[in-house]
């Protein structure tokens, strides 16, 4: 059992059960997925990007942000809901999955193998050396199993697709996001709520539980358009979801004005803990070489600064400079340099490219890679001016 981040250790619901299947089982699971991968990919909808070959989080983030940003530049309204599936992997209905595999033209051998894989599973819980009695697992895909993400993707493959051109859907495994745009708030609000009714009917049918307390909703509107948010609230199971000024989806935090300032603040906050480790190793009485401290920075902190690199092209000059200042401050700690050390010398001694140069190079590599993917070239063709995709296309 693993404690979930920022949860109360005294609550049983704060722990995530992890199943450590043996090596032979994991090998077999990977072989099965590889053998039937062509059938699996044909079954999954284009909205699903999680745990699929050739897909990455940046693609999905762009798929969500691009239509919303385009609507924003056209002074349209967008309502968006990021849905939280409660214990998604742990509550997957076994018989429901069997039915879907059998009716989606999956090979019978694959369906039977999956059925046997999920049959007669049991678990025990150990706490302080005390072992509970064995109990049957009547639902759920074993977390830690190599095939579980694929099984969950197949289970939710028939998710209700957008019923209107101005409604969008993005999935990354159990992370589900619907949005709707309109020239007026009532239009966007009505489209999204109609889509969510279809979605909740589907979740009820397949025993999927949505946690309304962790579901996020946001109303994105251009400056100057005054709207009463309380009048047009998103509803889930007839329960209103409070609009938030910011939303976090797949690790990216944006505001209702599409600003990345909340993401920058969250990023800088995340650096505090790894920076404490680097500070400790930079003390006089430690014998940790500078090369190791720089390596720790590259492994623990720079990935935080460069997460979702294509989206970071929307940082304004002030926000990017804050990130660069923090990077140089950390590098000076790693190298034990005075605060007045020139920036060129800091990067030369660290053996690193300056952050803006590194981000620019990474984006060029991403665009080259994205042009060979089926969906992104269409998005990159003639993007709306002053959007992320337009800026990327100019690199």
Predicted segments with their positions:
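Non-catalytic, peripheral interaction segments enriched in hydrophobic/basic residues
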Residues: 172-173, 204-227, 248-371
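Active-site palm subdomain of RNA-directed nucleic acid polymerases
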Residues: 32-48, 73, 149-179
């Amino acid at each position: 059992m693993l404690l979930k981040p920022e949860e109360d250790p005294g609550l049983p619901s704060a722990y995530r059960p992890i199943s450590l299947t043996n090596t032979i089982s994991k090998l077999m699971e990977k072989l099965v997925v590889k053998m039937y991968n062509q059938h699996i990919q044909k079954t999954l909808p284009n909205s699903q990007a999680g745990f699929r070959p050739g897909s990455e989080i940046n693609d999905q983030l762009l798929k969500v942000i691009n239509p919303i940003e385009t609507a924003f530049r056209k002074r349209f309204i967008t309502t968006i809901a990021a849905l939280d599936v409660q214990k998604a992997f742990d509550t997957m209905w076994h018989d429901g999955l069997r039915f879907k595999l059998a009716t989606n033209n999956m090979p019978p051998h694959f369906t039977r193998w999956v059925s046997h894989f999920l049959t007669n599973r049991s678990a025990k819980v150990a706490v302080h050396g005390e072992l509970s009695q064995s109990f049957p697992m009547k639902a759920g895909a074993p977390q830690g199993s190599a095939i579980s993400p694929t099984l969950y993707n197949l289970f939710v493959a028939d998710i209700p697709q957008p019923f209107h051109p101005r409604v969008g859907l993005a999935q990354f495994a159990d992370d589900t996001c619907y949005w709707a745009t309109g020239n007026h708030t009532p239009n966007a609000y009505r489209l999204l709520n109609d889509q969510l009714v279809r979605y909740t009917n589907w979740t009820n049918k397949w025993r999927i539980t949505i946690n309304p307390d962790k579901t996020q909703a946001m109303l994105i509107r251009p400056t100057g358009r005054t709207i009463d948010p309380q009048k047009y609230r998103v509803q889930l199971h007839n329960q209103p979801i409070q609009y938030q000024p910011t939303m976090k989806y797949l690790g990216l935090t944006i505001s209702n004005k599409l600003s990345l300032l909340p993401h920058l603040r969250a990023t800088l906050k995340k650096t505090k803990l790894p920076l404490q480790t680097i500070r400790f190793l930079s003390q006089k009485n430690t014998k940790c070489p500078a090369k190791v401290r720089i390596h720790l920075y590259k492994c623990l902190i720079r990935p935080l600064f460069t997460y979702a690199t294509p989206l970071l092209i929307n940082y304004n000059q002030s926000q990017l400079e804050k990130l660069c200042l923090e990077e140089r401050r950390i590098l000076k700690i790693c190298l034990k340099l005075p605060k007045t050390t020139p920036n060129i010398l800091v990067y030369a001694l660290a053996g690193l490219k300056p952050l803006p140069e590194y981000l620019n190079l990474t984006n060029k590599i991403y665009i080259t890679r994205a042009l060979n993917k089926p969906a992104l070239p269409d998005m990159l063709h003639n993007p709306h001016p002053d959007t992320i995709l337009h800026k990327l296309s100019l690199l």
